[in-house]
């Protein structure tokens, strides 16, 4: 029985699913010698492109006289799926006390995105000189690993036995508080149990909290347990205390049915009473860790993001030959369709190993019979609608425009259902190998709203997300209904979506913003949607692929 005045300590806000901390381990092979007598003293400097400039993030240690170094110092960086995060790795010779690359110390560099590294787990690239030529046979290998444990939860169940009685006319009303010791040796309250009334042998309710909250993900961090007799005046009577660590708690309950117990000690009684043993015992009956998988767990476990594009070719876009058309192909300024394709697709392509993307159009009359189609391949190859990289999608879009007649209506359900078919097949495998993301670029209100709602509700049960970017100045109020932010979307028959899989964004909100802002907004929800889907299906990530460089360890610096 719990007392309403004894509230549980609230959990701190959960870490944003889109953000994870990644450690990069770096090694090089075959670095150039700057002179014939000595080998280089290499160091790797990591830079991140942020706010239109390259900024140093981390650097490795310096290794002496080594042309194939394996650095021990990891390069840590925050990872965001929705951002491009371009990286540069500069290798330089620090033999003469150099602290940065120069024309005399530069050994080579390479550039890639953080998304490319985490999606492949291990990347090996040639080092390039400042003139763009390869630095001999020099290579750099980068291995990514997510900082683990930050999302895990632990479930604990405690009871006590023969606690001291602190009440004159009844039994104690015990509750327990758990504290973790901070780096400055101060104690921080992390949990308070409910009060069990009039009971010297209380069994407290099981509770669940994050490993980060309990011990800051440090299993050796000291934990302090204090047991009190509740008093409505707020002056609770101290019964006793004990200390432990999460490691000790795990080891003490490792086997089925195994429990761990501690004497509950009141230091004042211990120091004053010769025959004092304890003020009761506290028993840990259950200690289980619940692994909460992250987006990076799935990506590093081999899950590919399958990206599909659908482009609105209805007449409301305007004649492409007119400068006022939303499909105008001006040599001076890319139209909004092209801008959205480049920014959103440019990020998604880093997570697809073959870099081939199906691209469809809807709402146009297409050759040879010029009948209206709502899911035609923009490369006009219905057997193989895939384009090579996002640049191939853009090239197909440019070639497609002069060959079709913009028409209507704006029917979106057919393309959603088309992408749902392979997602349905993927679901049947029961594995986390491919998650589909459909990008719909449209200029107006959906004509087949009822069918679209039905298609989205069906897709919400599949490994699939839908991003809708509204292009132009139309009234998109109906489109926001699909987003599900104001409550679960329902199909016309009243069946609710299993989860929120649609993100709608009007392009005009980002017209004057940096190109990356649009991608940041529309892709921010994808990591959460991926994790939610696989968690709802009870599907764990695949085993991380082997990532340790098979290289001889470098000599100590």
UniProtKB/Swiss-Prot annotation:
Which residues are recorded as binding Ca(2+) 1? 167, 173, 229, 231
> Quick one: effect of changing residue 284 to S?
Inhibits calcium-dependent translocation to the cell membrane
Effect of mutating residue 272 to A? Does not inhibit calcium-dependent translocation to the cell membrane
Primary site of residence: cytoplasm
GO MF annotation, one: calcium-dependent phospholipid binding
Residues that bind Ca(2+) 2: 167, 229, 231, 237
Query: What does altering residue 284 to G do?
Result: Inhibits partially calcium-dependent translocation to the cell membrane. Inhibits calcium-dependent translocation to the cell membrane
Effect in UniProt of substituting residue 283 to G: Does not inhibit calcium-dependent translocation to the cell membrane. Inhibits calcium-dependent translocation to the cell membrane
From the record, give the transmembrane residue ranges.
none
Q: Which family does it belong to?
A: Belongs to the copine family.
Per its UniProt record, what PANTHER family does this chain match? COPINE, COPINE-6
Q: This protein is called what?
A: Copine-6
Instruction: Give the originating organism.
Output: Mus musculus
């Amino acid at each position: 029985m719990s007392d309403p005045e004894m509230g549980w300590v609230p959990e701190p806000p959960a870490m944003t699913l889109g953000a994870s901390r990644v450690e990069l381990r770096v090694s090089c092979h075959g670095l150039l010698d700057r002179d014939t007598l000595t080998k280089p003293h290499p160091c790797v400097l990591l830079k991140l492109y942020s706010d239109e400039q390259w900024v140093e993030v981390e650097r490795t240690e310096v290794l002496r006289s080594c042309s194939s170094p394996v650095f021990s110092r990891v390069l840590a960086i925050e990872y965001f799926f929705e951002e491009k995060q371009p990286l540069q790795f500069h290798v330089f010779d620090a033999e003469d006390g150099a602290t940065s690359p120069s024309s005399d110390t530069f050994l080579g560099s390479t550039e890639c995105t953080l998304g490319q590294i985490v999606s492949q787990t291990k990347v090996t690239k040639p080092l390039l000189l400042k003139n763009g030529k390869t630095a001999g046979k020099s290579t750099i290998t980068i291995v990514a690993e997510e900082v683990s444990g930050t999302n895990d939860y632990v479930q604990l169940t405690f009871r006590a036995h023969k606690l001291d009685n602190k009440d004159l006319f009844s039994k104690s009303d015990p509750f327990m508080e758990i504290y973790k010791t901070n780096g400055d040796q101060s104690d921080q309250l992390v949990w308070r149990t409910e009060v069990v009334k009039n009971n010297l042998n209380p069994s407290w309710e099981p509770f669940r909290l994050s490993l980060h909250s309990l011990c800051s993900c440090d299993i050796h961090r000291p934990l302090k347990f204090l047991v009190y007799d509740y008093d409505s005046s707020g002056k609770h009577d101290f019964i006793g205390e004990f200390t432990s660590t999460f490691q000790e708690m795990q080891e003490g309950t490792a086997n089925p049915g195994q429990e761990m117990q501690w004497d509950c000690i009141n230091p004042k009684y211990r120091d004053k009473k010769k025959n004092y043993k304890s003020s009761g015992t506290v028993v840990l009956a259950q200690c289980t860790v619940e692994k909460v998988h992250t987006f990076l767990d799935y990506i590093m476990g081999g899950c590919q993001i399958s990206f599909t594009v659908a482009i609105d070719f209805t007449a409301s876009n305007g004649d492409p030959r007119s400068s006022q058309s939303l499909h105008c192909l001006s040599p001076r300024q890319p139209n909004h369709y092209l801008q959205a394709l480049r920014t959103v697709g440019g990020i998604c392509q880093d997570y697809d190993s073959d870099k081939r993307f199906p691209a469809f159009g809807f709402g146009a009359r297409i050759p040879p019979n010029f009948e209206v189609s709502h899911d035609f391949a923009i490369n006009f190859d219905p057997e193989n609608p895939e384009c090579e990289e996002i640049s191939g999608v853009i090239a197909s879009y440019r070639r497609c425009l002069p060959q079709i007649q913009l028409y209507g209506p704006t029917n979106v359900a057919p393309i959603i259902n088309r992408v749902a078919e392979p997602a349905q097949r993927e679901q049947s495998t029961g594995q986390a190998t491919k998650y589909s993301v459909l990008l719909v670029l449209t200029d107006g209100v959906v004509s087949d709203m009822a069918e679209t709602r039905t298609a989205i509700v069906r897709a919400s049960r599949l490994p699939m997300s839908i991003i809708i970017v509204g292009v132009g100045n139309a009234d998109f109020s109906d489109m926001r209904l699909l987003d599900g932010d104001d409550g679960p979307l329902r199909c016309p028959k009243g069946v609710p979506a299993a989860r929120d899989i649609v993100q709608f964004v009007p392009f005009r909100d980002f017209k004057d913003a940096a190109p990356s802002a649009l991608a940041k907004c529309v892709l921010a929800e994808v990591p959460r949607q991926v994790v939610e889907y696989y968690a709802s299906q009870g599907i764990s990530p695949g085993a991380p692929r082997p990532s340790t460089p098979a290289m001889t360890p470098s000599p100590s610096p």
